[in-house]
A protein has these predicted regions:
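Blade/loop signatures of beta-propeller domains
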Residues: 25-71, 231-238, 394-402, 464-465, ...
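Repeat-blade elements of multi-bladed beta-propeller folds
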Residues: 42-46, 87-109, 137-163, 188-209, ...
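Short, conserved, GDST-rich strand-edge loop motifs in beta-rich repeat architectures
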Residues: 202-214, 272-290, 439-468, 555-573
Length: 585
């Protein structure tokens, strides 16, 4: 493994030490458990352990949001390219504690910003000194970093080249770092850490390079690994018999975990989404259901042992990974019971509610306008109607399923979804779940995979997509008490950024540059502002000095403007950028 370059810290314009001192509170497990009791702060990547991305702040509401204005902006770095990428982008969610904001750029530099006084002042920047060409060469889907976490007096972050870094919150000095992923194998890290008790949970990307996916827990006190659980079972382990070839395809079977998961403290359970099998499109190379790919996976947080799984698309031939966040909600059930659900909006175009205590299917429905790969879900199991457990290779709707004898096929939704990584949000008062939707179809071409074609740090996909069809988007609301679509606002472009929910508003952005606020009940547009850049990140909200703010990172990057831009030709005018926008009344 290549040796990591030491990270450096830059004091902003030499004045960090001259800023007025403010006492820092340590971020404890108790504070993280009770994050919603600190409404002015945003302490988790997904706002709370349940991943609802709901804030109770309501000074900005449906009646006055029309008066929302830019409060301040800040230019960040990380636009430069590397490897196969011409530029970096912004996909992160700012973390805010007691008026201080922590954000990352695509290369994993961490910025601390003082948000007091109605303006943003850079306190320090930590540059991890990632080797851009080496790491960027195996970043399948963009130069991306989705943010940081807080623990004690440390800012915990990842780098694209596979490091976990702890930075002193006060002075920006690196306290320690350790290598968690191995880019020599094609492993990179783009997701934000999840802090559970005294551990940082890390997910990995790299299924397009023939990795074997995993989740890993690092003890933040000792910097040692506590456990590592592979998402592709080893020989003799439960699920290993779902890889039925004689080529050891499981060893390069994918199952990456690149979106931050959720945590249920009542049962000490981590719930995490698992990505596509590899090679992506040649499912004849890997006969069997290919566990635990395309699954929601529940693990014992203390040991990493798998408690249950629910697989959405067995033997996936479409690159429909299930890597999305699982939102943990409690809703009224029959006869006075309470349903404890994990909600997942899949790239395959279906939304699922799973009993998070058992892993059993509760309900599912399509949330996109067009699904062609299957006729629907079996309402008992939630599996695609055409799924045949006696078959080692699934065809689903054979007319639109690409395979070695039908090398080119058009599928809906396309392999970006559905819903991709951009996070959903859930309003617990309205029981509405908001999904950032990609309304898509694309054309898939399959290439036969052989063991000889598998090489380290080279694409291992068994084909690839092209984009002859226009792709649009929507914000879709689902009533989780009924499992029915409650509303849909169609948008001219795919939703590549994600959702924020407040008591009576929903915030979202467009890759064409607009940030918008919608009525939480009706999805009627109440406010819109064009940032002048491409929105590829989710909005969040915080308060400081008694004033509420909305913040969003702006800078189009990721997979879209490299692999999918032909489906949205109007976005070719959007230039690379790296800006933080903050709004207030």
């Amino acid at each position: 493994m290549r040796a990591s370059v030491l990270a450096t810290v830059v004091a902003a314009a030499g004045f960090a030490s001259a800023l007025p001192a403010r006492a820092a509170d340590e971020v404890t497990h108790d504070r993280l458990l009770n994050a919603d009791k600190e409404p002015g702060n945003w302490l988790h990547h997904h706002k709370n352990f349940s991943a609802t991305r709901f804030s109770s702040l309501k000074d900005i509401n449906r009646d006055n949001v029309k008066n929302l204005k830019v409060a301040w902006t800040m230019h960040l770095g990380g636009v430069e390219g590397g490897g196969i990428w011409t530029h970096g982008g912004l996909e992160g969610t700012p973390i805010v504690e007691n008026g201080f904001m922590y954000v990352t750029d695509g290369w994993g530099s961490v910025y601390k910003i003082d948000a007091h006084g109605g303006q943003g002042t850079l306190v320090w920047k930590m540059d991890p000194k990632t080797d851009h060409d080496w790491a960027g060469a195996v970043a399948c889907c963009g130069v991306d970093n989705r943010g940081v976490a807080l623990w004690g007096n440390l800012v915990i972050s990842h780098t694209l080249d596979g490091r976990l870094i702890a930075t002193n919150k006060e002075n920006g000095q690196v306290a320690w770092q350790r290598q968690v992923a191995d880019p020599d194998k094609g492993e990179v890290i783009t997701g934000a850490p999840l802090i559970v008790k005294n551990m940082a949970i890390t997910g990995v990307a790299g299924a397009e390079y023939g990795i074997r996916g995993w989740l890993a827990a690092t003890d933040l006190s000792t910097q040692k690994e506590v456990w590592r659980t592979f998402t592709i079972p080893g020989k003799g382990e439960p699920g290993a018999d779902t890889w039925k070839d004689d080529k050891n395809s499981a060893a390069s079977g994918g199952g990456s975990t690149w979106v931050t998961g959720s945590y249920d403290p009542a049962t000490d359970t981590i719930v995490w989404g698992v990505g596509n099998p590899g090679p992506d499109w040649d499912n004849q190379y890997r006969p069997g259901d290919n566990l635990y790919t395309d699954s929601s996976l529940a693990l014992d947080a203390t040991t990493g042992k798998i408690k249950w799984h629910y697989q959405h698309t067995p033997n996936d031939p479409y690159d429909y990974d299930s890597v999305a966040e699982n939102v943990l909600v409690d809703v009224p059930g029959p006869n006075g019971t309470t349903l404890k659900l994990a909600l997942e909006a899949d790239r395959n175009g279906f939304a699922y509610a799973i009993d998070r205590t058992t892993g059993k299917f509760v309900w599912g429905l399509p949330f996109v306008k067009k699904v062609t790969w299957t006729k629907g879900l079996d309402q008992e199991s939630g599996k695609p109607i055409e799924y045949d457990p006696s078959k080692q290779v699934q065809r689903y709707n054979a007319a639109v399923t690409p395979h070695r004898d039908n090398k080119i096929a058009d599928i809906c939704p396309g392999n970006m979804g559905g819903k991709n990584w951009p996070p959903t949000a859930y309003n617990p008062d309205l029981k509405l779940w908001y999904i950032p939707v990609i309304e898509s179809c694309n054309r898939i071409t399959v290439e036969e995979s052989t063991p000889e074609k598998l090489k380290a740090r080279e694409f291992w996909t068994g084909g690839g997509p092209s984009q002859p069809f226009k792709i649009t988007g929507s914000v879709t609301a689902i009533d989780v008490t009924t499992g029915k679509v409650a509303g849909k606002l169609e948008t001219p472009f795919p939703n590549l950024g994600g959702i924020l929910a407040t008591p009576d508003l929903v915030f979202s952005g467009q890759p064409s540059g607009e940030v918008m606020a919608l009525d939480a009940k009706t999805l009627e547009k109440r406010w819109e502002f064009n940032t002048g850049g491409g929105v590829n990140a989710p909005p969040m909200t915080f308060s400081v000095d008694g004033k509420q703010y909305i913040a969003i990172l702006v800078g189009l990057g990721g997979a879209w403007d490299k692999w999918f831009i032909d489906a949205t030709p109007e976005l070719k005018r959007i230039q690379p950028g790296s800006m933080l926008h903050v709004f207030a009344l």
